[in-house]
């Protein structure tokens, strides 16, 4: 289904250029998957279309900084490079995406994986941010459960988390 034009590594990240037909398929998949996954993804994940992006994250941080005494900021090292394909595909299956989208994601993950590691995803790919959002959804759900009982607030942009706490 998808075909690569070329691939390269830069600063530890794997990048690819898809053939034009594949680029079109990925643009269409981004729209389709975005619609299918909209209700599945956490509202605290702001890089997803319609969730406010970086500006919403900055506004959130400014408001919370005035209300909470402590803040923790972290990002996940080698985020895209360390994603387990089987875990991601299971999450997509659980989210109920259609078979066409599922098969396209399988291609998207496997083609650049020349060493057959079963891990990693291209950085900067058109559907990588959306798939990354899916991959961290279990962590988002866990954080959402902690918010009321521990009086914490959190927000995520890609793999960057902000957690605010009173003590």
What are these regions (language model features)?
Residues 1-8:
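A structured, charge-rich N-terminal accessory region that forms the first stable segment of a protein
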Residues 8-11, 159:
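Short, ordered beta-strand-loop transition motifs
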Residues 11-42, 117-145:
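Conserved pre-motif C helix in the palm subdomain of viral-like polymerases
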Residues 14, 43-48, 87-93:
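Charged, low-complexity surface segments at secondary-structure and domain boundaries
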Residues 20-21, 25, 53, 97, ...:
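Generic detector of ordered secondary-structure context
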Residues 26-84:
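Active-site-proximal segment of RNA-dependent polymerases
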Residues 58-167:
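Conserved polymerase palm-domain catalytic core
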């Amino acid at each position: 289904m998808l075909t690569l034009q070329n691939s390269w590594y830069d600063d530890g990240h794997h990048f690819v250029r898809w053939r034009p037909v594949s680029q079109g398929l990925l643009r269409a998949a981004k729209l389709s998957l975005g619609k299918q996954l909209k209700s599945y993804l956490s509202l605290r994940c702001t890089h997803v279309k319609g969730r406010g992006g970086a500006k919403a994250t900055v506004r959130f941080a400014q408001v919370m900084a005035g209300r909470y005494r402590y803040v923790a900021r972290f990002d996940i090292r080698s985020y895209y490079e360390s994603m387990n394909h089987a875990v991601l595909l299971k999450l997509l299956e659980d989210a109920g995406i259609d078979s066409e989208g599922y098969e396209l994601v399988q291609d998207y993950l496997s083609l650049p994986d020349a060493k057959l590691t079963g891990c990693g995803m291209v950085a900067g790919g058109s559907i990588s941010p959306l798939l990354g959002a899916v991959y961290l959804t279990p962590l988002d759900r866990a954080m959402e459960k902690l918010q009321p009982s521990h009086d914490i607030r959190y927000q995520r942009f890609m793999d960057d988390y902000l957690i605010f706490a009173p003590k």
